[in-house]
Design a protein with these regions (language model features):
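Motif-centric detector for short Cys/His coordination patterns
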Residues: 1-77, 95, 126-127
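Extended, charge-rich alpha-helical interface modules
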Residues: 61-134
Length: 134
């Protein structure tokens, strides 16, 4: 069987399966911990906690960056974060809506999707660094 990597931006929040307030046995039903998932097109689903946390990386919101003078090494990190995010968004637009992308061979499509995931992880690390600037 072939392997695939999906690239999609979702919204999610912790939720117990079946809408119960706690995990465990409820009558004849076993409710598990998991996440309510909402896709960009509005589709809603539920995912078990372990599967969700293995498949998704939490996207940190961009930090509020004051327009003040910063040491050059910090400003370079901020500039790099914005530059990388701009490139990542362009890549995702290409992946999600380009006829050219659909004509690429599946291996190249997979590499581009992997690249997007790595870029998101990199942006998240840069955001964490920026949030901890003193």
């Amino acid at each position: 069987m072939e392997k695939y990597i999906g690239v999609k931006l979702i919204s999610a929040e912790p939720q117990i399966e079946g809408g119960f307030s706690t995990a465990g046995q409820h009558g004849g039903i076993i409710a598990r911990e998991g996440y309510k998932v909402v896709y960009e097109d509005g589709y809603k689903s539920w995912s078990p906690k372990d599967a969700f946390e293995k498949a998704y990386i939490k996207v940190k919101p961009f930090p509020s960056i004051e327009e003040t003078a910063r040491p050059p090494h910090q400003q370079r990190v901020i500039d790099e974060m914005y530059d990388l995010e701009e490139k990542r968004l362009k890549l995702n637009a290409f992946i999600g809506g380009s006829e050219i992308f659909t004509k690429l061979d599946l291996d190249e499509q997979s590499r581009l999707k992997q690249q997007s995931l790595v870029m998101q992880a990199y942006v998240t690390i840069l955001i964490e660094r920026i949030e901890n600037f003193k």
